[in-house]
């Protein structure tokens, strides 16, 4: 039996899903919890989800081992949500970082000197710096961004039909920014 189940977004395919989709997800989560009564369930929002809707009951669900994270850190003092599991080899830290747009996190990451939002890589890098990793433990990033291998050409990456392509692929984040993690559970 697994110790955890991780969903790296999207939960739904649109920000306001149909009632049937919400009911289906509710049924799925009920069955998953029944099948995994003592395991941790971790979910983050993706670019198609409504982060605010997924954050409803966040604290209550977390107390029950269901970590459904809609919004990234958006206020000063907030950090990336971390869930720590332990096994015979020590701690495994899961850092739950939902889909991020630089404007969403400007109160946490700051802005450029002229007041403009940071680039996607700059904002993402500053968010990661909020939660320093312990190199003596295993660290897993759960994220839903558009990562590219260093030197990769975003023009050659196929995207889903309903996915908005940023002009010049400004949303691309170099994979080197997550090199300190032992594993990346990356959604899309």
Annotated model-derived regions:
Residues 1-7, 11-186:
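Extended recognition/assembly regions associated with phosphoester-bond processing machinery
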